[in-house]
Amino acid sequence: MMRIPDSISAMVYTMRHPHMWTLMVWAIAAIGYWLMCSASEDYVPLAFVSMACIGFVGAMPLIKSDDNTLHWVCGIGGCVLSQVWCVVTAMAKPLPTVGLLVTAWAVYGVVMVCARGRKWCFWLEVWCMAMVVMVAMA
């Protein structure tokens, strides 16, 4: 039976071929960058740095480190920058996009309350990527 990992990055340790993790995350970063650039050309540097952080997250498990400081810094940076991009892009779009953004974060809060805070990092990573896709498609 599959368990939900503590974070998306923890999945690398359950894979048969860990190098596939890096390729998968780089593909996600490339698709995320493409979505972000196609939605708004005004914030391309923000999109690039955000997805570059995510790309580094993909490569970090291959570098053996006990404290994973760079991994955490890149992960947090990628999540924060992607959400900044969501907010500034949503502000330039019609008002329903802003309402959708606020509603989605409220739903995330409800999920965390129902899950009693378990696996918060995993759900936050999934939610940030879902927010990027949702705002890019709006």
Predicted regions and their residues:
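Transmembrane alpha-helices of multi-pass eukaryotic membrane proteins
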Residues: 17-26, 42-47, 73-75, 96-101, ...
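N-terminal topogenic module of multi-pass integral membrane proteins
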Residues: 1-40
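Juxtamembrane "helix-exit" motif on the non-cytosolic side of transmembrane helices
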Residues: 36-40, 59-66, 88-93, 110-117, ...
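A glycine-rich, hydrophobic loop/mini-helix early in the fold
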Residues: 24-25, 29-62
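Juxtamembrane loop-transmembrane helix junctions in multi-pass integral membrane proteins
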Residues: 11-16, 41, 66-70, 116-119
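Membrane-proximal helix-loop-helix units in multi-pass membrane proteins
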Residues: 46-101
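Terminal transmembrane helical module of multi-pass membrane proteins
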Residues: 92-138
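Hydrophobic cores of alpha-helical transmembrane segments in multi-pass inner/ER membrane proteins
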Residues: 22-33, 80-89, 104-107, 127-136
